[in-house]
Amino acid sequence: MESFILLFTNDKLLIFNFIIILLFIKSLSYIIPLIIAIAYLTLIERKIIGSIQKRKGPNIVGIFGLLQPIADGLKLLLKETSLPNSANIFIFIIAPILTFFLALCAWAIMPFNEINFYSNLNIGILYLLAISSLGVYGIIISGWASNSKYAFLGGLRSAAQIISYEVSIGLIIINVLLCSGTLNLKEIVLAQQNIWYIFPLFPLFLMFFISSLAETNRSPFDLPEAEAELVAGYNVEYSAMGFALFFLGEYTNIILISAVSTILFLAGWLPPFDIFLFNWIPNSIWFGFKTIIILVLFIWVRAAFPRYRYDQLIQLGWKIFLPLSLAWLMLTSGILLSYDGFPN
């Protein structure tokens, strides 16, 4: 028996293939639930917006419209992909794939509880910032490769918008890192066992949430795809699965930034009170519940607020959020140095 085991353990190629298969299965265990969550997030969004606007929302396909996301997915999957004659075909096809792939890569380090995560990086925050910075390239090259002035302007707007608000997001995150003393997402959550960072850093949470709206091109900052000005922006020439991949990438980033907000400010999977009833609830349920609250805020803002002008958007980022986040960074540093941590 031992010789039989050694025969296989010495076969490095077999071990390598086995590891690759395990990683593939583990990746699918993240990707498939995420795609299902995106599908039903669109249904919830349409229902909530319909309710705010005194409409019913989707209610024909299935009971209460529960099969509507499946119908929409099948429609996009079965439609013919139309390629513009004047487009750079290779880059045109690669752009939505790159956007969705980078959005998925960011989920590799997200901890849903103390033990359930794909990879526990000690520099998890830096990894997230790097991936979010790369995500804009898919949008830029899609606008350029489409050879359309509307798509190109949408890509330029998106690049300027994301770069503008990444600066303030980075400074806000530094405040959280100073308070927690770590770049590890799991340890940031555990550092909030005494107090959630949303309470001492509530103004920063508001700025982070508003900056997240701009970072994900969501209303009222959806200027890169403003229908009245740019038809549909950078994805105006896309149809079928190309459009679907951009759509999946956008909503993947929305769920991701909601999960990051939960980790940085709402103590991730930790219950609000240390009582038996709350401790009995699985940690992943708490994490999902808090993330859903942030997602509902995203949807409510889309339904309630009009779109900003582009100059107002840029001025908000550079003239208001950047100075405020810098000032709060100095304030946080001073308090932590004076009291050797948060004052009691």
Swiss-Prot record:
It is an enzyme of class 7 (translocase). It comes from the Eukaryota. It is a multi-pass membrane protein. The chain crosses the membrane at residues 18-38, 58-78, 89-109, 123-143, 159-179, 195-215, 228-248, 253-273, 281-301, 316-336. The keyword Coiled coil does not apply. It catalyses: a ubiquinone + NADH + 5 H(+)(in) = a ubiquinol + NAD(+) + 4 H(+)(out). Pfam families: NADHdh. One of its GO terms (molecular function) is NADH dehydrogenase (ubiquinone) activity. Keywords: Electron transport, Membrane, Mitochondrion, Mitochondrion inner membrane, NAD, Respiratory chain, Translocase, Transmembrane, Transmembrane helix, Transport, Ubiquinone. Its EC number is 7.1.1.2. GO terms for cellular component: mitochondrial inner membrane. PROSITE patterns: COMPLEX1_ND1_1, COMPLEX1_ND1_2. GO terms for biological process: aerobic respiration. The keyword NAD applies. It is found in: Mitochondrion inner membrane. Belongs to the complex I subunit 1 family. Core subunit of the mitochondrial membrane respiratory chain NADH dehydrogenase (Complex I) that is believed to belong to the minimal assembly required for catalysis. Complex I functions in the transfer of electrons from NADH to the respiratory chain. The immediate electron acceptor for the enzyme is believed to be ubiquinone. This is NADH-ubiquinone oxidoreductase chain 1. It comes from Cyanidium caldarium (Red alga).
